[in-house]
């Protein structure tokens, strides 16, 4: 994949030591542009967000925004082994303020996927004055349930030694794809070829040791505009509902995309549309058109009318079969 002329900036941070931030957009032309801060999921890195931003549905947003893609320590392509104590999710989240300080950004739209969404949540809860709005894709706000806990306990015995066992790879695939998917093997091969498995195991351990957010997320994010996103086939669908249940319904919108597990890959146009709506509600990207508005009712009214149901379900179209030659 093309690096899209990304600029990599090293940021000194208290908990992570250093963070590699990949800037997508021209910082020299930042006047009037919206800053969007991103944090990726386990089993990927900043490139997952670069792919999303490069999707045609994001073209107008890309012109009006600058993206700061934060790479979790040790998750860069072909990274050297990470030595020392790996930061907690709280620690990574707290260090995001150092990223904004480095770029002299007072506040930003914060956007996370999976574990990255959990990290964004922690950042927003600790630094609400640095946030204009948050986008949380497949966000888990609770600790592991009893069944998941038992599986994670066994898995951690090997992960603590920086070993990605077959069970750990299976867990990662289920986390990413939910059920069966034709993309699983392709994803696994790319993952093993690019990411350092020892470092990947450390990020995974940090996630399995996450602390609960659900009891305080509602009060700490009471004034923050939030968009929660999930696919109906996502493995953590129920935890997204739990997160939504804990949040201020007047400030939070839930988007459920039917028949997909990985929203960023399988339904980028739906995600882009909802991102634009959130940004408009936060007073930014006002000049950006909303793709597909003429074909589909969107979330704009639900952002203003707290009494209406907050769930928006989007069904992917069934494409006709390709005719044989």
UniProtKB/Swiss-Prot annotation:
InterPro entries: AB_hydrolase_fold (IPR029058), NDRG (IPR004142). It comes from the Eukaryota. Residues 296-325 are annotated as: Disordered. GO terms for biological process: signal transduction. One of its GO terms (cellular component) is cytoplasm. Pfam families: Ndr. Belongs to the NDRG family. This is Uncharacterized protein ZK1073.1. It comes from Caenorhabditis elegans. The lineage of its organism: Eukaryota, Metazoa, Ecdysozoa, Nematoda, Chromadorea.
């Amino acid at each position: 994949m093309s690096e899209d002329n990304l600029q990599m900036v090293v940021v000194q941070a208290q908990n992570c030591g250093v963070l590699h931030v990949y800037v997508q957009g021209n910082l020299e032309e930042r006047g009037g542009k919206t800053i969007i801060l991103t944090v990726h999921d386990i089993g990927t890195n900043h490139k997952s967000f670069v792919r999303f931003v490069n999707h045609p549905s994001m073209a107008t947003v890309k012109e009006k925004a600058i993206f700061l893609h934060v790479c979790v320590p040790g998750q860069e392509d072909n990274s050297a082994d990470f030595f020392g104590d790996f930061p907690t999710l709280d620690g990574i989240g707290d260090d995001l303020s150092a990223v904004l300080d480095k770029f002299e950004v007072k506040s930003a739209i914060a956007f996370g996927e999976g574990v990255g969404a959990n990290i964004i949540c922690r950042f927003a809860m600790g630094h609400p004055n640095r946030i204009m709005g948050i986008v949380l894709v497949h966000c888990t706000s609770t600790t592991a349930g009893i069944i998941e806990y038992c599986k994670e306990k066994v898995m951690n015995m090997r992960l603590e030694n920086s070993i990605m066992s077959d069970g750990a790879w299976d867990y990662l695939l289920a986390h990413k794809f939910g059920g069966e998917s034709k993309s699983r093997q392709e994803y696994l091969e790319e993952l093993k070829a690019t990411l350092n498995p020892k470092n990947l195991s450390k990020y995974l351990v940090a996630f399995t040791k996450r602390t609960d957010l659900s009891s305080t997320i509602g009060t700490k994010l009471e004034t923050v505009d939030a968009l929660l996103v999930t696919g109906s086939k996502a493995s953590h669908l129920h935890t997204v509902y739990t997160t939504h249940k804990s949040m201020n319904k007047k400030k939070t919108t839930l988007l459920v995309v039917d028949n997909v597990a990985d929203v960023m890959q399988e339904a980028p146009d739906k995600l882009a549309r909802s991102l634009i709506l959130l940004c408009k509600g936060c007073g930014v990207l006002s000049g950006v058109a909303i793709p597909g508005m003429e074909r589909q009712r969107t979330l704009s009214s639900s952002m203003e009318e707290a009494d209406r149901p907050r769930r928006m379900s989007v069904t992917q179209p069934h494409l006709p079969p390709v005719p044989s030659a």
